[in-house]
Amino acid sequence: MRGVWVSYIELDMQNETDKSEASFREKFKNIAINSKNAGFNTLIVQVRPFCDALYDSKFFPYSHILSGEQGVNPGYDALEVMCEVCSQLDLDIHAWVNPYRISTDSTPQALSETNPYVIDNEIGEETENGIFLNPANKMARNLIIDGVTEIVRNYDIDGIQFDDYFYPTQDSDFDNTEYADYVETVGEMNCM
C-alpha cells in the first residue's frame, strides 16, 4: 500500500461558494488524480472528524465540513462520491475515523441537536482542549463500534483507519467514575 491521508481540511466545503455535489466531486477528483499521479494507490479519507459524518449516518449528524453547519444535509453523500471516484481511478479507499473527538475549542462552532454528545452528555467529557467521547464509557465505545460497522456495511471501502485515539487529557478526573467501576468489577490487583 502506498497511501496518503486526506484530512477534513482538504475536503472542507465551508468557504466554497458552490457547495454542491458536483463541486465536491470535482474537488475530490482533483485530490485523487494528483495522488495517483504522485504514485499513491490508496486514499485514507477523514469521514468522521468531529463526532459527525461525511456520509449519511443514523448515529452521527452531517459534518459542518460539507455545509458550514453541523447537522445540515448537504444534499449528497460525500463518502459515496469518494468511493465512486476512487473506483473509477482504480484507487483503494480507507475510511479514517477520529473515534473520540467531538470538538476542539473552536471547531465546529456549534454542535447539532442530533450530535450524540448533545443527546447524552454522559458519553463525553469537556477538557481544556475541547469535548471528547470518553473511551472508558461503555455507551461511547458502543457508539464508535456502531459507527464503524455502519461504514463497513454501507460503503465499498478497503479499510478503516483510526487517528487521535489517545486520551485527550492527563487529568485523572476524566474517567474517575468509570475507573472506580472497573476496580470494583475486576479488582485492585488487575489495575495498573
Located regions from the model:
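Hydrophobic faces of well-ordered beta-strands that scaffold small-molecule active sites
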Residues: R2-V6, L43-V45, I93-A95, I160-F162
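Active-site-adjacent "subsite" loops/lids of carbohydrate-active enzymes
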Residues: W5-E26, C83, I93-N154
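Active-site-proximal loop/turn and secondary-structure-junction residues that shape catalytic pockets
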Residues: E10, P49-C51, P99-R101, F166-P168
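Short, solvent-exposed loop/turn and secondary-structure capping segments
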Residues: N15-T17, V47, Y55-K58, T104-Q109, ...
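Aromatic- and glycine-enriched glycan-recognition loops and surfaces
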Residues: K19-A38, I65-L89
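Catalytic domains of carbohydrate-active enzymes, especially glycoside hydrolases
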Residues: E26-A53, N154-G159
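Aromatic-lined carbohydrate-binding/catalytic grooves of carbohydrate-active enzymes
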Residues: A38-P74
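Polysaccharide-binding and catalytic clefts of secreted carbohydrate-active enzymes
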Residues: N41, L89, V118-M192
